[in-house]
């Protein structure tokens, strides 16, 4: 039924005005409780049915998140990850909530880092994820292995997921660009399917952080560096200046294009959390981002028609109206 309704709604855009009356009746007969708002290129409403009735928007929420991000951060915005080195060659890594630290990006990151600090062995790695509170939780995220339930983090790689292949007890990477690490092997052996699959890191934020550290170390070694000490967590010492700042190679506009194309919940809420962190200062929080979002929606007269609980649509507490969404798309 819904596919028929979509086709009919699209066809309305090509109808002459005198034919619209009959089309409205067909829409009402096909889906009397459906929400329909068809508009022409000038914003004139052609067919209206339940346009002010709130609905659960699901992944349509990502459109609002993308609009908010462009308004607050700007299309040229780039996420940053900062690196610090103390006198004992302990490397501190401070995550900045980059949603797109995929393996290809880590290869670029490691190359720039090794060029900046040299190839002398590092005596340890300390991961600082304090930009995100350790107890941050997104409404609707559940404790499953599904990629759409991946936890958000100040420092996570490959969308806080592991993509691997399991044959019996043997685990290998499913991607030539991604080295396999000890944590990836143990996690996928315990929770991954036989054959090829992807699991999210949801049980414990420390697990995803450890995986990020292991994968960064693997790429440092690929770039010609080496790490002799262990991976731990902690804060960057006060007064220590960054020796290297990695700026994401993708602009926000490019990341948002990937977000909307793949409907990635993890990216959506990383971006949503940055909206509040950027405008109100870190650490990030859902409350800060909701405050900024609600203020911006209110300024546009959309406070009553767009209600957000998070930025991806995974929460069923989000509520939109068709007219509110249409008005936002016209801005």
Annotate each PLM feature.
Residues 292, 307-331:
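C-terminal soluble interaction/assembly domains
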Residues 15-57, 73-79, 112-121:
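Beta-lactamase-like hydrolase cores
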Residues 44-47, 302-311:
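Extracellular-facing binding/remodeling surfaces
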Residues 49-55, 202, 312-315:
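A short glycine/serine-rich beta->alpha loop
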Residues 6-14:
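Bacterial N-terminal signal peptides
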Residues 56-69:
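Active/ligand-binding-proximal structured segments within catalytic/core domains
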Residues 23-25, 71-303:
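Conserved serine DD-peptidase/penicillin-binding transpeptidase domain
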């Amino acid at each position: 039924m819904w596919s028929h309704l979509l086709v009919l709604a699209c066809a309305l855009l090509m109808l002459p005005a005198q034919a619209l009356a009959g089309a409205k009746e067909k829409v009402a007969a096909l889906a009397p409780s459906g929400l329909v708002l068809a508009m022409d290129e000038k914003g004139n409403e052609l067919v209206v049915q339940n346009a002010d009735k709130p609905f659960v928007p699901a992944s349509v929420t990502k459109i609002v998140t993308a609009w908010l991000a462009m308004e607050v951060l700007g299309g040229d915005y780039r996420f940053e990850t900062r690196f610090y080195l103390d006198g004992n060659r302990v490397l501190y890594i401070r995550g900045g909530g980059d949603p797109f630290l995929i393996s290809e990006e880590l290869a670029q990151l490691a190359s720039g880092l090794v060029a900046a600090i040299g190839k002398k062995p590092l005596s340890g790695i300390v991961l600082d994820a304090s930009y995100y509170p350790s107890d941050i939780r997104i409404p609707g995220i559940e404790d499953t292995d599904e990629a759409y339930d991946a936890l958000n983090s100040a420092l996570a790689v490959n969308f806080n997921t592991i993509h691997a292949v399991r044959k019996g007890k043997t685990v290998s990477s499913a991607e030539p660009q991604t080295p396999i690490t000890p944590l990836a092997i143990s996690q996928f052996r315990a929770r991954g399917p036989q054959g090829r699959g992807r699991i999210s890191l949801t049980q414990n934020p420390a697990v995803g952080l450890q995986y990020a550290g292991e994968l960064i170390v693997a790429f440092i070694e690929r770039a010609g560096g080496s790490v002799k000490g262990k991976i731990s967590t902690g804060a960057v010492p006060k007064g220590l200046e960054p020796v290297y700042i990695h700026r994401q190679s993708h602009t926000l506009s490019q990341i948002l294009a990937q977000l909307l194309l793949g409907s990635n919940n993890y990216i959506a809420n990383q971006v949503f959390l940055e909206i509040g962190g950027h405008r109100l200062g870190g650490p990030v929080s859902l409350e800060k981002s909701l405050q900024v979002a609600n203020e911006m929606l209110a300024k546009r007269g959309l406070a009553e028609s767009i209600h957000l609980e998070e930025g991806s649509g995974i929460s069923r507490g989000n509520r939109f109206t068709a007219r509110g969404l249409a008005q936002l798309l016209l801005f």
